[in-house]
Amino acid sequence: MNILPYEIHLLVIDYLYNDDLSIYFVNKYFFSMLKHSKIQNTIIKKIIKKGELGVIRYINKLFRVNDELVIGNKLFESSGINNYLLTACKYGHCKLVKYFVECGADIHYKTDYALQLACKYGYLEIVKYLVKKGANINTDDCYAVQLASREGHLKIVKYLVELGTNVRKDRDLAFRWSVENNHLSVTKYLVELGSDVRSEKNYAIKKSCEYGYFEMTQYLMNQGANFRVDNDYAVRFASKKWTFKYCRIFDIMWR
């Protein structure tokens, strides 16, 4: 430490009391100062969230040589390589995903949850990699495509369809979720594939009216959705809201 300027001493001290890990990743010397850190919990997942592949490799190296920095240090307590894979998928770090798989992580852990996370958060590159490695796109009644539809990731939806997934599982759940979250491009694509706009007692148009999705409501009506079901539920909901957005919906119902 004496070789560092006084200003750096102060900077290091400030960071030692901060939950930001960035300074520790500057080089091996700064990394070694983690033993003086005030951080209370394991930092492995935080490192993965930041996408620090080099740091993860270095930590593994320290474990292999039984380095005192990591052995018995609660900062480096492991929650398991499979959970690390899930974290990497959630935050979209494809290089880390590949690294954990190469190190033995199970891509089928928790019924292909890694693939489902990648679909949910929209990481097509990771989705393709996991599929290439054998991930099952149809687990949990094709939940992967349902998640992608719910979050509006059209490219992933199309990719899974190309691989043969069934978008109509659970009574057109993928379609209904796409409507509920106002992803019109996904909705149109699923309808083109045969999704029923009247499924579950016209659930889609009722939700579209409830949330004030004008373009979605107009599209569903043009496709034959019935806004008069359940004692005019959609009409009554739109009329109660009486804002400009809902007035537009109310207007198209009676054209």
Swiss-Prot record:
Identification of the protein by name: Putative ankyrin repeat protein R880
The species this protein was found in: Acanthamoeba polyphaga mimivirus
Lineage: Viruses, Varidnaviria, Bamfordvirae, Nucleocytoviricota, Megaviricetes
Swiss-Prot/TrEMBL keywords: ANK repeat, Repeat
Top-rank taxon, per record: Viruses
ANK repeats: 79-109, 110-139, 141-169, 171-199, 201-229
Alphabetical list of PANTHER family matching this protein: ANKYRIN REPEAT PROTEIN, GH09064P
Gene3D superfamilies assigned to the protein according to its UniProt record, in alphabetical order: Ankyrin repeat-containing domain (1.25.40.20)
Ranges in coiled-coil conformation: none
SUPFAM superfamilies: Ankyrin repeat (SSF48403)
